[in-house]
Regions:
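Fe(II)/2-oxoglutarate oxygenase catalytic core
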Residues: 2-40, 44-115
Length: 115
């Protein structure tokens, strides 16, 4: 695995790691350190299914469920921790996701939590 900073201030590319596979403790620690140092990490060319995404996310702590949405549905009932953000509608005109009308402007979630 290679960590390549993208600038002098924040952000790095994480290269040569397959997030679809389980990671060892050393790799998880290196990614965590890079996240603390760089604040924004970019992982290119990843092919993750929902299980892969949840496994990788859980390496860094307990997941908070998405908040309520205006449609009152869980978009992925088998994966309630995943919030689908999409502006796509199905054939009946029902949104397949949340926040599809530009509601997700830049913001920071959970800033009121210590850790």
């Amino acid at each position: 695995m290679k960590i390549s900073p993208l600038g002098a201030v924040i952000a790095a590319d994480i290269l040569d790691v397959d997030l679809a596979k389980p990671l060892d403790d050393q790799t998880i620690a290196l990614i965590g350190d890079a996240w603390n140092d760089q604040l924004v990490l970019r992982f290119r060319n990843q092919r993750l299914n929902d299980d892969d995404l949840l496994r990788f996310s859980r390496y860094f702590g307990e997941l908070d469920p998405p908040g309520p949405n205006p449609y009152g549905v869980t978009f992925l009932p088998e994966y309630p921790e995943i919030n689908v953000i999409s502006n796509v509608r199905d054939d009946a005109g029902v949104p397949i996701g949340n926040l599809g009308d530009g509601e997700a402007v830049w913001h920071a979630d959970m800033t009121y939590i210590d850790n």
